Amino acid sequence: MVFRRFVEVGRVAYVSFGPHAGKLVAIVDVIDQNRALVDGPCTRVRRQAMPFKCMQLTDFILKFPHSARQKYVRKAWEKADINTKWAATRWAKKIEARERKAKMTDFDRYKVMKAKKMRNRIIKNEVKKLQRAALLKASPKKAPVAKGAVAAAAAAAKVPAKKATAAGKKAAAQKAPAQKAPAQKAAGQKAAQPPKAQKGQKPPAQKAPAPKASGKKA
């Protein structure tokens, strides 16, 4: 932002420290680079030389000739209504609040604390009401859905189709050995039979069954 507060004739300044601290004055003439001739006819400040280091320039400018007498300065001050405009600025309000805070007692600070807590509670409740109303408008009521259907839909949405087919194949492969268990047992029983004779070897002779004993003697 461009700086526009320059030292000039008619510029209104705020006295920050010194015997006239907190009052407004108007620059009537510039003496040198360090001092200016000021006058405050409506703030009870006599015409005198004042250093720039104790002045803070404001945005207000009065229209009167160079080295004008006090009556012309007063007339321009009242015409521009400087006192009312200054009281309405944020600068003046901050100064007033700072002075009021410095004069507060312990009981005054306690009352301010309780008032702030009450204000914050009211604001919080109102914000919650607005949030609930916004949620009700944003999400209309839907028909109730069974929990199982909701879980299945969520699982289907999370698991892609390829992964689902792979999982189905794995499950089928795991179930297949359990069904073929009897066949494996049968194969084990067949393996218990005597091995076949290899080529060039005679099969082992099998004993003929013994004849049954009869009651007649030869």
UniProtKB/Swiss-Prot annotation:
* Subunit field text: Component of the large ribosomal subunit.
Q: Which residues carry this modification: N6-succinyllysine?
A: 85, 207
Protein's name according to its UniProt entry: Large ribosomal subunit protein eL14
Enumerate the residue ranges of region (4 X 5 AA tandem repeats of Q-K-A-[PAS]-X). 174-193
Family classification: Belongs to the eukaryotic ribosomal protein eL14 family.
| Modification Phosphoserine occurs at | 139
Q: Which GO terms describe its biological process?
A: ribosomal large subunit biogenesis; translation
Q: Where in the cell is it found?
A: Cytoplasm
sequence repeat segments run 174-178, 179-183, 184-188, 189-193, 196-198, 199-201
Query: At what positions is N6-acetyllysine found?
Result: 79, 85
Name a GO molecular-function annotation: RNA binding
Please tell me the species this chain comes from.
Oryctolagus cuniculus (Rabbit)
InterPro entries registered for this protein in UniProt:
Rib_uL2_dom2 (IPR014722), Ribosomal_eL14 (IPR039660), Ribosomal_eL14_dom (IPR002784), Translation_prot_SH3-like_sf (IPR008991)
Q: Where is this region: Disordered?
A: 159-218
Q: Mainly localized where?
A: cytoplasm
Question: What keywords does the record list, in alphabetical order?
Answer: Acetylation, Cytoplasm, Isopeptide bond, Phosphoprotein, Repeat, Ribonucleoprotein, Ribosomal protein, Ubl conjugation
Q: What does this protein do?
A: Component of the large ribosomal subunit. The ribosome is a large ribonucleoprotein complex responsible for the synthesis of proteins in the cell.
Kindly list the GO CC terms recorded for this protein.
cytosolic large ribosomal subunit
Q: Where is this cross-link: Glycyl lysine isopeptide (Lys-Gly) (interchain with G-Cter in SUMO2)?
A: 124
Q: Residue ranges of region 2 X 3 AA tandem repeats of K-[GA]-Q?
A: 196-201
